[in-house]
Every structure is written in structure tokens, then in C-alpha cells.
Amino acid sequence: MSVLLFGVSHRSAPVVVLEQLSIDESDQVKIIDRVLASPLVTEAMVLSTCNRVEVYAVVDAFHGGLSVIGQVLAEHSGMSMGELTKYAYVRYSEAAVEHLFAVASGLDSAVIGEQQVLGQVRRAYAVAESNRTVGRVLHELAQRALSVGKRVHSETAIDAAGASVVSVALGMAERKLGSLAGTTAVVIGAGAMGALSAVHLTRAGVGHIQVLNRSLSRAQRLARRIRESGVPAEALALDRLANVLADADVVVSCTGAVRPVVSLADVHHALAAARRDEATRPLVICDLGMPRDVDPAVARLPCVWVVDVDSVQHEPSAHAAAADVEAARHIVAAEVASYLVGQRMAEVTPTVTALRQRAAEVVEAELLRLDNRLPGLQSVQREEVARTVRRVVDKLLHAPTVRIKQLASAPGGDSYAEALRELFELDQTAVDAVATAGELPVVPSGFDAESRRGGGDMQSSPKRSPSN
């Protein structure tokens, strides 16, 4: 079984396609369930951000697994399979490992080196793990990807500028307006992205921030934090948006809503009320939602300048220094090689364990025959014979089992495990039973502070029945 990746990202598709594919957390669970309904798929995890939708799965067959995942995503998006595949990319086995390591390191982000994606990978794993849809393979892959991402950020300067989608978008806004100092800003959405936007706006010296959110209490919490940093701020319900826009200079919208929250009518109303002049006071709107928060028609209005995810990735400040990128890629390559060696050795371990179990069974059978032939044998003598026989077997098996693990670490090493099974007539069922017995280690079930406090163990059986 190998890891298969089916994905669509900002590098392969325009924003309008990513909008159709956008997946919230409840959708993740449904998609995983549908993928796992196929007997060809044994583990699955969905990574969904504003820039990508990727399904990682452990499959028994490449083409069959690809068809299953592609069909599920096509039905979710409303696109035909043929239309979806025009924008999709596929990675298999080693290439899938390399891709996830690069993603976790920020090398495949719209803003190269940004750290937010590391948390998004962590969250994707946590969702899959809490729903028991990851087994040994994806557990080890996700954990290693998180480790690689942390190593890249600690050993290189790829994130030295502290760039993120938010910081780059606001940098573009600042360039358009000349300065953000003293301006009036509106933040739509009080989640993690909204909070990050508030931090950057505060540092830029804006004069006033208005926070709008469907949940007024969340908007009030964020507004309170902004005021504590020394910037006047107030929280408003989302239905006040049209009036708020009239006084705004810069707007950051990042709600995760399924349809636009900033309508053409809202912006028309704001422009009419403010009597703006495009040259002296444009309205800059940073649309960082996926699907888009801003009606696409808004970008065609005079006096309005819209920054979206597409424009962010083409901004020069979104790209880290070439030397840092190269250093990060070297780390990823080394980590991929190390990971694959470990996986190959892990794959041969059940065969070696099954061989040792077979040898132990033979020893016990022969000792039983000895008891039947020499019933008068004293217990001290029998124990000495048993120790001697076991030592002989251990010595005979030691060198070949150590050597086969070494050989198995090289590409194509799985053939040695197969040869061992053939030579000693090891039943594949017995080998699989050994592998399944140690499917997953017991680890905390979450990554954030709440899940650590709550505790919980990994489940030994990765695949659960799909929900109805």
C-alpha cells in the first residue's frame, strides 16, 4: 500500500475553481467518509486552506484509488471529472511524501515561507485522527511533515520577513494608499485570520478599526484585544457593513462564508455616501476568504481596488530569498530520503518478526518432542537444553535478520522481504497480523492546548465505517 495525493491549489487553478472545491471542517469528514467507503482506500486525510484542497490517502491500487478520490471531489465541487482533472495534480508514493513535506515547510505556499500552513497541516491531521481515519502510514507521514516544517523554519531564514498572506495583502494596500497610518480599517471576520489582520493593522498605525462578525460576541473579544494594544476599536454586527464601508479606507475580509458577504450593492452604497475620488481616496478591499468574500463585480467599480489571493501570490514580497528557498529544499530532500529509509525498514520488520515467531514455534515443538522421547529428563537438564537450542536459533537468525533490514532500506528493498517469506514459507496472513498488532502508537489525540488537556488515545483501527 502507498500514499496517493490528489490536489488542486493556487498553482494549478484559478480562484474560481478553488471556490468550487472549498471544503470546511464538516465537509472534510464527509469527504473522508466517502473516500473510505471504497475497499481500495484504508486511510485518508484532507488538507484544505484558502490556497489548496488536497486529499492524502493510503490505497491498495493507484488507478482505482485515483478514480475514487477524483470522483468524490468532482461530485463535491459540482464539476465533471474531466473538468476537475484539468486543474488537478497527482503525487504517488515518494512524490506524495516530498510534496507534503514541502507544503508543511511553506515552500508551496502563495507566500513562500509562511508559517500558517504548518498549523493547517496540524489541524488536518487532528480532524482525521479524531475521526479515526488515519492509521500507521498517515500518522507517521503527518508527524514527520510537521517535524520537517518546524526544522525548515528553525534552520533557515525562509520566514525571516514574517510574511503571510495577510501581511503581503496589507503591504499592497499600504502601497496603494501611500500609508496606513491614521486610516480607518474594517476587519470582517473574527477568526484566526481576522485576528492576524488586526495585529498587522495595529502595527501599521491605523487610526481606528471596526470589527464585524456574524457572532457579535467574537467581534467584541477581538475589538477588546485591539483596544488593549492602544488602537481605538469597536465591534459591530455584520448587517452594519454597508454603513461602515462608507468611512473605511482599507477592508480585510476573511470569513470563510460560502457566499460573498461584501455585495456590489453594499459597496455602491458606500461609494455614493462617501463621494470618493479614485486618485485621492480609493477604497482598498483585501479579500482573503475562500470562497471569496467579495462579489467579483466589486473589482470593476471606480475608486475600488481589490486585493485577492491570486494577486498576493504574484507580489514580489511573497517570495523568499533564493538562498533560503534552496536551503529549505535541501532539508526537505534529506528528510524525504531519511523517511523513506525508515518506511522501508518498517515494512520488512513484520516479516522478520514473523520469522522469529516461526522459529520460536519450531523450538517449542521440538522441546515437546524431547519431553515425549525422554520423559525422565530432569528439569535442570531440560532447561539447559532449551537455552542451548534457543541460543543456536538466535545466532543463526541474528546476522540474516540484521542484514535484511539493512538491504531493505535501499530502494526496491521490499523484494528482500518477499524472498524471506518465500524461503521460509511464511504465510502472508501471519505477517499482516504482526503488522496490524502494532498499527499505531498510543499518543495524545490533539495538537492544541485544549486537546492536550482533554487527552485521548489513538485508535488501533484506522478505518471506520462511513456515516450514513
UniProtKB/Swiss-Prot annotation:
<dbReference type="InterPro" id="IPR015896">
    <property type="entry name" value="4pyrrol_synth_GluRdtase_dimer"/>
</dbReference>
<feature type="compositionally biased region" description="Polar residues">
    <location>
        <begin position="458"/>
        <end position="468"/>
    </location>
</feature>
<feature type="binding site">
    <location>
        <begin position="49"/>
        <end position="52"/>
    </location>
    <ligand>
        <name>substrate</name>
    </ligand>
</feature>
<feature type="active site" description="Nucleophile">
    <location>
        <position position="50"/>
    </location>
</feature>
<dbReference type="Pfam" id="PF05201">
    <property type="entry name" value="GlutR_N"/>
</dbReference>
<keyword id="KW-0627">Porphyrin biosynthesis</keyword>
<comment type="subunit">
    <text>Homodimer.</text>
</comment>
<feature type="binding site">
    <location>
        <begin position="114"/>
        <end position="116"/>
    </location>
    <ligand>
        <name>substrate</name>
    </ligand>
</feature>
<feature type="binding site">
    <location>
        <position position="109"/>
    </location>
    <ligand>
        <name>substrate</name>
    </ligand>
</feature>
<dbReference type="GO" id="GO:0050661">
    <property type="term" value="F:NADP binding"/>
</dbReference>
<dbReference type="InterPro" id="IPR015895">
    <property type="entry name" value="4pyrrol_synth_GluRdtase_N"/>
</dbReference>
<feature type="binding site">
    <location>
        <position position="120"/>
    </location>
    <ligand>
        <name>substrate</name>
    </ligand>
</feature>
<dbReference type="InterPro" id="IPR036343">
    <property type="entry name" value="GluRdtase_N_sf"/>
</dbReference>
<keyword id="KW-0560">Oxidoreductase</keyword>
<protein>
    <recommendedName>
        <fullName>Glutamyl-tRNA reductase</fullName>
        <ecNumber>1.2.1.70</ecNumber>
    </recommendedName>
</protein>
<dbReference type="GO" id="GO:0008883">
    <property type="term" value="F:glutamyl-tRNA reductase activity"/>
</dbReference>
<dbReference type="Pfam" id="PF00745">
    <property type="entry name" value="GlutR_dimer"/>
</dbReference>
<dbReference type="InterPro" id="IPR036453">
    <property type="entry name" value="GluRdtase_dimer_dom_sf"/>
</dbReference>
<feature type="region of interest" description="Disordered">
    <location>
        <begin position="443"/>
        <end position="468"/>
    </location>
</feature>
<dbReference type="InterPro" id="IPR018214">
    <property type="entry name" value="GluRdtase_CS"/>
</dbReference>
<feature type="site" description="Important for activity">
    <location>
        <position position="99"/>
    </location>
</feature>
<feature type="binding site">
    <location>
        <begin position="189"/>
        <end position="194"/>
    </location>
    <ligand>
        <name>NADP(+)</name>
    </ligand>
</feature>
<comment type="similarity">
    <text>Belongs to the glutamyl-tRNA reductase family.</text>
</comment>
<comment type="function">
    <text>Catalyzes the NADPH-dependent reduction of glutamyl-tRNA(Glu) to glutamate 1-semialdehyde (GSA).</text>
</comment>
<dbReference type="GO" id="GO:0019353">
    <property type="term" value="P:protoporphyrinogen IX biosynthetic process from glutamate"/>
</dbReference>
<dbReference type="InterPro" id="IPR000343">
    <property type="entry name" value="4pyrrol_synth_GluRdtase"/>
</dbReference>
<dbReference type="Pfam" id="PF01488">
    <property type="entry name" value="Shikimate_DH"/>
</dbReference>
<comment type="pathway">
    <text>Porphyrin-containing compound metabolism; protoporphyrin-IX biosynthesis; 5-aminolevulinate from L-glutamyl-tRNA(Glu): step 1/2.</text>
</comment>
<dbReference type="InterPro" id="IPR006151">
    <property type="entry name" value="Shikm_DH/Glu-tRNA_Rdtase"/>
</dbReference>
<dbReference type="InterPro" id="IPR036291">
    <property type="entry name" value="NAD(P)-bd_dom_sf"/>
</dbReference>
<keyword id="KW-0521">NADP</keyword>
